[in-house]
Amino acid sequence: MSSAVLLLLVCGCALAVLSPVAYGAPMDTDDRPVWDSIRLCDIPNEPNPGQCMLPAECVAYGKINDVSSLSSIERFSFIKQIQCNGSDTVPYVCCPRDSDAYREPYVNETMVPKNRVASRIAFDADSCGIQSYVAKIRGGQLAEIDEFPWMAMLLYERDNNALTQGCGGALISRTYVITAAHCVTGKNFQQTKGRLKFVRLREYNIHTNPDCVYENDLKDCSDDMIDLVPQAVIPHPEYDSESSNQQHDIALIRIEQTPPFTDFLRSICLPEQNFESSATPGKKLSVSGWGRTDIFKDNLGPDVLSPIKLKLSLPYVEREKCSKTFRPWSFALGPGQMCAGGERAKDTCAGDSGSPLMSYDMKRAIWYITGIVSLGVRGCGVEGLPGVYTNVHHYLPWIKMYTGA
């Protein structure tokens, strides 16, 4: 493998640059599990089961996967419901076995609004790390409409042009968002990314506002998205944008106080202990954001960020193994960095730079921010090459100096 493929990057818009081998190309048939060819699944409005397969191999899916579909509640809800658990490493969709087209590619529900009052009063008004989302059997990389309500999208403006999404972040209090330092500062930063204009909260689908989905005979709509003006941008004082290892890649953005928390807006908890001190190799972590995915690749292209909030599960990689992996390229893992990923076609292309790496405490039913998407390799999901994240626990004293939390 050439050194160019393995070159560590600091990505301004998303974690890594896709390569066909790593993320875009279908798996060779010989690499697939035997059950993959007979995995059956349900398709809305069709009496016969479909087959779980790669989006690029489903002719019917190619006919409905376009930008206009993402603006239609009925069509987008259909696309969400045909996600399936064909593989743990790449997105799959349920494809008709006896036709090259879906019979009725939309979900026409009764449009009765979902009542969310009960879930809103079940939690303390300011509690962190809690979400109303309940895991469903259906798989896929598209997040649910109320999943990870602390996610933030950073919007940039250059030369008075339209706003562009560039990085992610996470709400950690009513007035602070945490992100990567390289998302807010650095050499020639404004020339390459533009000026940080807004922090967007309560976003799910950038093509609609408010965002709605049909599920279980109900129409579920989020609160309107909100764009908040940054009051102060605080990169870590030791961050050096020209450093090859990008240590201290962490920043805080102070915003005006958010509206009251709801199912669609809540902060994530800061870690109470160092995740690495008790984690076992392979322990699952989660990442979310508006990164890259094969779900919309054929229509939007491989290098376009997703308009829909994504999610992905990643394995923790122990420090010694990660350091050994990058040693040939003279990359030294700093005390404030950690690693995750490194499985084939499974890395944080789904999450923008600055997005949170999250851990879930099952006993307390609380989400914690463990890391921040920082460094990646050329090609998301290159087997054996994990992504590098800023370890949030290492910077707690610095964070609390500003937030007071």
Curated annotation (Swiss-Prot):
Annotated SUPFAM superfamilies:
Trypsin-like serine proteases
Question: Which InterPro entries does the entry link to?
Answer: CLIP, CLIP_sf, Peptidase_S1_PA, Peptidase_S1_PA_chymotrypsin, Peptidase_S1A, Ser/Thr_Proteases_Immune/Dev, Trypsin_dom, TRYPSIN_HIS
Provide the Gene Ontology terms for cellular component: extracellular space
User: Mind telling me how this protein is modified after translation?
Assistant: Proteolytic cleavage is necessary for activation. Cleaved and activated by CLIPB4.
Mostly located where? Answer: secreted
List the Gene Ontology MF annotations in alphabetical order: serine-type endopeptidase activity
Q: Which residues cross the membrane?
A: none
- Where is this chain glycosylated? N85, N108
Stretches assigned to the Clip domain: 41-95
Under SMART domains, the record lists: Tryp_SPc (SM00020)
Stated EC number for the protein is 3.4.21.-
List, alphabetically, the Pfam families matched.
Answer: CLIP, Trypsin
Q: Which cysteines are joined by disulfide bonds?
A: C41-C94, C52-C84, C58-C95, C167-C183, C322-C339, C349-C380
User: Where is the secretion signal located?
Assistant: 1-24
Q: Which residues form a coiled coil?
A: none
Site (Cleavage): residue numbering on this chain: K136, I137
User: Upon deletion of the gene, what happens?
Assistant: RNAi-mediated knockdown in female does not affect lifespan and basal melanization. Simultaneous RNAi-mediated knockdown of SRPN2 and CLIPB8 in female, reduces the spontaneous melanization and the lifespan shortening occurring in SRPN2 RNAi-mediated knockdown. RNAi-mediated knockdown severely reduces the melanization of injected Sephadex beads.
Q: Where is the active site?
A: H182 (charge relay system), D249 (charge relay system), S353 (charge relay system)
User: Where is the protein found, in the record's own terms?
Assistant: Secreted
A Gene Ontology biological process in which this protein takes part is:
positive regulation of melanization defense response
What does its UniProt record remark on the domains?
A: The clip domain consists of 35-55 residues which are 'knitted' together usually by 3 conserved disulfide bonds forming a clip-like compact structure.
Recorded family membership: Belongs to the peptidase S1 family. CLIP subfamily.
What biological function has been recorded for the protein in this entry? Serine protease that functions in the melanization-mediated immune response. Preferentially, cleaves substrates with an arginine at the P1 site. May be involved in the activation of the prophenoloxidase cascade upstream of CLIPB9; does not cleave prophenoloxidase.
What protein does this entry describe?
Answer: CLIP domain-containing serine protease B8
**What is the protein's species of origin?**
Anopheles gambiae
